[in-house]
């Protein structure tokens, strides 16, 4: 964890003002995952945390909504007698995917986020390995769940997020998330079952198992604690100056720790809003619609964007002119004149017109891409990490 000993503590906001390493911005401190959810709701309230699509309809999800959902999910798990158990969550990125993750961890359970694209054999293997008792999944996973059902006798409940139950098999273990939510709401409000609020978590206890192939190609379960996740989140906030008025578009798989820690923990701690990309084919359309100020990506996305930029430039026969403009803008920048966003307006417009920086990790990125994007006026903060470190190890701050 970063050294906060020389950092001014802002008592009123419960935050740190990070002044070492040349960074000067507020980092809101929280003690555990639920403490983070509670403090975010207090700071940002009805501000939109997520824009997302469900059943073809655009919806919003506020910071207050997140706290309410975590409270009700935690209460529901306790009411059904499966709090503190091994719980799987799989499927598409969804606000309630995040809420389930946080609620399970906040009730002394172990969350197992699984890749939605793994084979049926891998899925059942991971579930059996962990003695999983509860499965939360989005509607896109219904066919896989149905196909694997005979191998999942240990599972007590299958809870479908964003589904009406019309595709459920004839099995009493299935319920819609809406029904489960009502169970949790009743338990929380009428029976005073409030485990997330009252639980004092062991920060060193395992709260998540992340299956990753790593460098060996053999799947393994990485065990993470709340201390791991909280530390990585606060360090991410300290390095990257994300602000309350920032807008992100989430495009990476949510089961990866990189995406979850950075996009689903660090961004909300800073009060940013995130639009969940509903489909790869809609990415550019969503950039235009939501106008992100920053993105969290892997090199494959950055490489693809880079190739498309130059393909469009070459299509217009403007490569030499653009290179000359880049050289000129770089020279002007050295004397304090920044006209990059004006000169390369067309490039910025392709990303919605407000993109300032990209956080990139997961694999090495070619240095020339970092340099060229900087010439265009888009800073790339390149990071390095591994799942075992949940995942942050190092990152160059904005402007470095």
Locations of the language-model features?
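Structural core segment of the AMP-binding/adenylate-forming
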Residues: 1-4, 106-183
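AMP-dependent adenylate-forming
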Residues: 9-18, 36-61, 166-168
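Conserved pre-ATP/AMP-binding loop-to-beta segment of ANL
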Residues: 45-48, 160, 179-211, 218, ...
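Conserved AMP-binding/adenylate-forming
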Residues: 57-61, 74-118
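Conserved ATP-dependent adenylate/AMP-binding module captured primarily in the ANL superfamily
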Residues: 116-148, 232-249, 280-293
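Gly/Ser/Thr-rich phosphate-binding loop
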Residues: 175, 293-296, 305-400
């Amino acid at each position: 964890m970063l050294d906060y000993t020389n950092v001014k503590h802002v008592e009123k906001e419960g935050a740190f003002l990070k002044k070492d390493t040349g960074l000067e911005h507020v980092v809101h401190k929280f003690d555990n995952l639920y403490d983070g959810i509670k403090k975010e709701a207090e700071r940002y309230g009805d501000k939109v945390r997520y824009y997302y699509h469900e059943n073809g309809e655009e919806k919003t999800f506020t910071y207050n909504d997140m706290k309410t959902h975590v409270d009700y999910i935690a209460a529901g798990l306790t009411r059904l007698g499966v709090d503190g158990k091994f719980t799987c969550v799989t499927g598409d990125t969804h606000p309630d995917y995040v809420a389930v993750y946080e609620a399970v961890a906040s009730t002394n359970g172990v969350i197992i986020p699984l890749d939605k694209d793994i084979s049926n054999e891998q899925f059942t293997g991971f579930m059996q390995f962990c003695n999983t008792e509860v499965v939360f999944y989005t509607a896109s996973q219904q066919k896989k769940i149905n196909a694997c059902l005979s191998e999942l006798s240990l599972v007590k409940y299958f809870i479908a997020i964003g589904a009406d139950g019309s595709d459920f098999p004839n099995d009493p273990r299935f319920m819609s998330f809406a029904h489960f939510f009502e169970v949790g709401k009743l338990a929380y409000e009428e029976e005073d079952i409030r485990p997330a609020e009252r639980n004092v978590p062991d920060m060193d206890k395992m709260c998540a198992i992340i299956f990753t192939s790593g460098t060996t190609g053999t799947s393994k379960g990485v065990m993470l604690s709340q201390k791991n996740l909280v530390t990585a989140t606060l360090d991410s906030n300290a390095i990257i100056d994300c602000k309350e008025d920032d807008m992100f578009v989430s495009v990476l798989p949510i089961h990866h720790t990189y995406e979850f820690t950075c996009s689903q923990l660090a961004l909300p701690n800073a009060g940013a809003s995130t639009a969940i990309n509903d489909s790869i084919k809609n990415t550019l359309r969503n950039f235009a619609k939501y106008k992100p100020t920053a993105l969290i990506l892997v090199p494959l996305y950055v490489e693809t964007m880079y190739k498309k930029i130059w393909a469009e430039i070459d299509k217009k026969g403007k490569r030499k002119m653009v290179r000359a403009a880049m050289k000129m803008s770089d020279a002007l920048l050295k004397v304090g004149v920044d006209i990059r966003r004006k000169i390369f307006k067309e490039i910025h417009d392709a990303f919605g017109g407000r993109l300032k920086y990209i956080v990139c990790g997961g694999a090495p990125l070619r240095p020339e891409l970092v340099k060229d994007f900087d010439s265009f006026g888009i800073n790339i903060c390149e990071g390095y990490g591994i799942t075992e470190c949940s995942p942050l190890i190092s990152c160059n701050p904005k402007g470095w």
